[in-house]
A protein has these predicted regions:
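Conserved beta-strand signature within the Rossmann-like core of class I S-adenosyl-L-methionine
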Residues: 130-137
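A C-terminal cap/extension of S-adenosyl-L-methionine-dependent methyltransferases
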Residues: 176-222
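Conserved class I S-adenosyl-L-methionine
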Residues: 1-41
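A conserved beta-strand element that flanks and buttresses the S-adenosyl-L-methionine
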Residues: 103
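Acceptor-substrate binding/catalytic loop of class I
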Residues: 147-163
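Class I SAM-dependent methyltransferase SAM/SAH-binding core
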Residues: 48, 53-91
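Short catalytic micro-motifs in class I SAM-dependent methyltransferases
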Residues: 106-110
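A short glycine-rich, Lys/Arg-flanked "PGG" loop and its adjoining helix->strand segment in the class I
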Residues: 117-129
Length: 222
């Protein structure tokens, strides 16, 4: 599956920013994700962006890693003074406690459960004590409600709060969690999406946040 992921994102690299985030749908998600990261990370900390892609969220890290050479090439053009490398998240070769924090967006939705467990352990080794790991995964509750089933590896993974706690309990403590895209963005007319966003942000922090499309988890290393 790794080769499929690599090839998929290599093929998308040139048009990725434009097609995924250069429209009102992508902007909607980008605003929500940035809002959450800003709450927890300082841009001058020694942070690692795992699966950094074209560098969309690299303003919060000095280091980035991605499996796609073509995505990394674009990230380097956008952030020439940052340490960005091609690599596999399951084979991170950094010293223990090298980073203050780490984060990863739009990666875990593609992986299998056994890979998640391995990654949580690996990241716990390279992040210092009390450091944060911020990540997003599709909401299992939302998909159960909408009866959504992915037809390929892309975005297939999903998880709920109890499962997340179980597979991270050995190395991480859950600090908080937030929703992303509570409302089905594709059903909201483009002209009014920016007006719906504040209400969406509110719902993503409410008692109903687990019903959002994705959940962003804030973990602290034990």
């Amino acid at each position: 599956m790794k080769n499929q992921i690599l090839q998929y994102y290599d093929n998308l690299a040139i048009e990725y920013d434009k097609n995924r985030f250069g429209n009102s749908y992508g902007e909607y998600i980008n605003i929500q994700e940035n809002r959450i990261i800003k709450k927890y990370l300082k841009t001058n900390d020694k942070n690692l962006d795992i699966a950094c892609g074209t560098g969309r969220l690299l303003n919060y890290a000095n280091y980035g890693i991605d499996i796609s050479p073509k995505m990394v090439a674009i990230a380097k053009q956008k952030h020439p003074y940052k340490n960005i490398v091609v690599g596999d998240i399951e084979e991170l070769n950094y010293e223990n406690s090298f980073f203050r924090n780490a984060y990863s967006f739009h990666l875990f939705m593609h992986l299998e459960l056994h890979q998640l467990k391995k990654i949580f352990k690996k990241v716990s080794e390279i992040v210092e004590k009390d450091g944060l790991f911020i990540l997003d995964i599709p909401s299992k509750k939302r998909r159960k409600l909408t009866k959504y089933k992915a037809d390929s590896w892309h975005g297939r993974n999903q998880i709920n709060l109890a499962e997340l706690k179980e597979i991270t309990a050995e190395h991480w403590k859950l600090v908080s969690y937030y929703g992303v895209a509570f409302f089905p963005i594709h059903l909201i007319p483009k002209k009014i999406r920016k007006f719906v966003l504040p209400l969406d942000n509110l719902m993503c922090r409410s008692i109903f946040k687990e019903m959002s499309s994705h959940i962003v988890y804030i973990l602290k290393k034990k």
